[in-house]
Amino acid sequence: MQLEHLPVGELAAGQPLTIPVYRFKGTSDAAPSVYIQANVHGAEVQGNAVILQLLQYFKAHPPLGDITLVPLANPLGINQKSGEFTLGRFDPITGINWNRAYLDQAVHLDDWYLLHGELPEQVLFDAFRRLLIANCEQALANPWGVTTGQRLALNLQKLAHGADIVLDLHTGPKSCKHLYCPEYELSAAGYFHIPYTLVMPKGFGGAMDEAAFNPWWQLSDYANSRGRELKVAVSAFTLELGSQERIDLADASRDAEGILSYLSYREVIAQSIQPEVMSRFACMLKDYRKFHAPMAGMVEYLAEPGVPLAAGAPLVNMLRLDRVDAGTEVTRLSLNEDVIPVLHFASASVHQGTELYKVMTNYFTLSG
């Protein structure tokens, strides 16, 4: 195991901001390489506990493929505190979500494929990977500079582009475990110990998983349109590991085992680790809906994340103590279709328009 401290910024008083990068050299050149990061959002700490479990596993069981692990991936966000709460979801300078600052790799495939399209598959993949990394380096070297969030994101993205498998470990506010999975990799969702999957289309919205898989998906589609069948060479997922501001080592062990189950399936490790048998459900990303508060007030969250909710069943109670005289101090809200609540807002005090819940609609069974 090798440990490097990678500079990703500086504070106003001159102190450097660095992230720890743990590397394990694989024993087989044929095995896929893996990049795993955690804690890009300051309050989403459980992924660090999962990486600790993986570190201990790889020390005892040398992997076949190269492994790069980056816990504590956002030192500025992690240290962005207000009283007892960690903020750290948005760059405090620009207000942009830390997980929306990655580079959109807008490769001009007409020109690039004309020069590289006849290369052997692995040679072509290597050339494309070098291009993606070079684009990140070019963006970092912009003579006009980059924002704090972009500097962090580009350094993380460079690391991710070096791998065949990219896992970004997050949590929700108050949340059940769920997985963001690209549509072309849906069969892999059954290996993680996660019951709910959001199926992602091709496209880029600024997040790490999209930054990792979207260029390769575009390359595959372009090659196929030119009569050459190319697989999507990179697999990328976002794992949402429950709720923020929470460390649970026993739960981290279960999540690490789910990751190892997937890595076993991909032959990154020599050990055979079977996925947990569970009911799994999915919906398309377009059917993952947000419910916004139609009124302000104090909220009693009634629907438990991860428990199916029938149409018309109580979702929340809204308390308005300014309406006691009118007898309308409690308003019960529900939805008009069957859903699976996935997460809800962390605070019980909300403005009108606050995102109260995210729910799966039009969901379907993946496996039993």
Give, region by region, the residue ranges found by the protein language model.
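Structured catalytic-domain cores with a bias toward divalent-metal coordination
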Residues: 1-368
